Amino acid sequence: MTGTGKKIIKETNAAADHVTSEAAAAGKDATRKLARFAAAVRYDDLPKPLVKLMKQCVLDTLGLCIGATTLAPEAKIIASYVKAMGGHAQSSILGFGGKAPAAWAAFINGSLAHMLDYDSTGDGGHTSVATIPVAFAMAEKSGGVSGRDLIAALACGADIHTRLAQSVDIQEWAMVEGWLPTQLLGYVSGAATAGRVLGLDERQMENALGIGFNQMSGSRQMAVGEAAHLRSMQAGFSGQGAVLAAELAERGIIGSKEIIEGRYGFFKTYVRTETPLWDALTGRLGTYYSLLETHAFKVWPACGITRVTTTAASELRERFGVRAQDIEAITVTGSLDATRLLCEPMDRKRRPKTSIDGKYSIPFTTAVMLVKGNVTLRDYTAEGLQDPAVLAMADRVTYRNIPDADAGTEGGRGSAATIGKTTVEVRTRDGKVYSSKPQSVPGDAENPVSDELLEAKFRDCASFAAKNINSGNIERAIEMIWDLENLADAGEITRLLCA
């Protein structure tokens, strides 16, 4: 979110402690406006840069689903459970092969998409994992869903997810109240995505959003201390709930109304605010897509907050020529909530036992970059987690906090909450001190990744598939994704990857 947007949020929340008549009027029919937008959005209405972004997100996300099948130990457990559930073979299980009912396919593919913590980010967490597995599960089940309709569904889902996040002080709220926005908002954004694939009308879409809302969950406790497998699975839960919401609405189930603005709606119950930014939520619907300014791709497979410290470590190597063998001490200075979350307990963060613990550790990930000059998927394998040089470097990492009010962490997404506010300082054995305070990170909108990098990332992830994928199918899938708007049946892509 821009600095202006963050300032507006603070001023607005400080200016009122009750619902004014103006605020009530501004929020009138907010849920219905979102439902109307989701039901009506068409491919031809989308700006070309947004179409390109959606295709990049598809390439990125599908590859990550496949790679997780052998790199994340929980993947096999979930796959065996889903397959044991049986049911109609409707939608593909990426990386493992086979099919499951659409809701279960959305559950496992949504879980797989976030397991490597390599997925793209935006305001509100990880919009792609909350929407793309849902869209493909529904597209395969329905059959004959065009690439253009799929893109429209993804665009509306991602936009609604982003708008919900930008209408509140998302970073501060999520940290203080303890919610994980990806899962929490994913029930509604995913329901909009699934509903658009199904072609729901406005009333059905409103019901779908209401059914999704009533399933909302996602506590940040799953990421405190030793990270639980549930952190990987958050978009699986919301994805399954989203499919359920859309399918029930299609069959006539009536959902809750006014789920955003109502007496017990999203703002009152989850955010506890009387003064959200209504214009950020419903202003210029269908004509303005702020995710074009905020969406970011990861070039390193770890928690978004580590992107800043990893960038700093990279800059120390490249700009100052700092060599691993010369480093005596490393100090990370950053905001209280973000830095503490990824640095405590320090003994566990320096010696992560699992892949997800390593990805959620500033000491370990910073050490990898300082020792190796890059951070890859292999650094979080069982072997990578035991690298003696990396562990020795992690032992030299300490951290200091800046109060959040001073660091300015309000608003923003993942790394955006710490860009320009986090410093990595190294002291060498000869007493010299070097520091880096990144103002941007690779993969952000202002520092975009190339299509070639995303293709290489896709191929690398696909090489870890539990069920081997023919190299020809991998290349054909890449071609189909770039040409998605011309596909008559978008489900061809996932079927090809599971052939």
Residues covered by each model-derived region:
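Function-dense linear segments that define catalytic or interfacial modules
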Residues: 99, 105-160, 164
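Short helix-coil transition sites and intra-membrane helix breaks within transmembrane domains
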Residues: 123-128, 179-184, 299
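Well-ordered alpha-helical segments within folded domains of soluble proteins
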Residues: 128-136, 186-193, 239-244, 306-308, ...
